[in-house]
């Protein structure tokens, strides 16, 4: 059964965000998303020091059965990527909310957080999709 930590924000596209400081957030794909994809074999990450808008395609995750785009849930500047995933993409499967994070972003406007879901809202979304 997929887990949805209460301290995270979630998008309808199955990304999660963890607040690291006032403007910095870590982004990854949810436990539900990695379960649906299956064993990941490749992760294409965004470039650093680029600006992205909420909803922009920023990464691609590929499994043995499919590929999926990852969309930025927030607007801002990509400041760091998880280079370890280049050699170990399956880390996302093993630890989606920890070592399997994808990138870090400095956000433009904290008001965009109002468009995201809490853990209960995300759980409801998953149940509605099933």
UniProtKB/Swiss-Prot annotation:
Positions where N6-lipoyllysine occurs in the chain: 65
Limits of the Lipoyl-binding domain: 24-106
Keyword Lipid biosynthesis applies: no
Gene Ontology biological process terms, A to Z: glycine decarboxylation via glycine cleavage system
Cofactor binding: number and manner: Binds 1 lipoyl cofactor covalently.
GO cellular component, one term: glycine cleavage complex
Signal peptide limits: none
Keyword Cytoplasm listed: no
Pfam families (alphabetical): GCV_H
Cofactor requirements of the protein: (R)-lipoate
Keywords: Lipoyl
Cross-referenced InterPro entries: 2-oxoA_DH_lipoyl-BS (IPR003016), Biotin_lipoyl (IPR000089), GCV_H (IPR002930), GCV_H/Fam206 (IPR033753), GCV_H_sub (IPR017453), Single_hybrid_motif (IPR011053)
NCBIfam families given in the database record: gcvH, PRK01202.1
Binding partners and assembly: The glycine cleavage system is composed of four proteins: P, T, L and H.
Function: The glycine cleavage system catalyzes the degradation of glycine. The H protein shuttles the methylamine group of glycine from the P protein to the T protein.
Record-stated family: Belongs to the GcvH family.
Protein name, per record: Glycine cleavage system H protein
Species this chain originates from: Coxiella burnetii (strain RSA 493 / Nine Mile phase I)
Gene name for this UniProt entry: gcvH
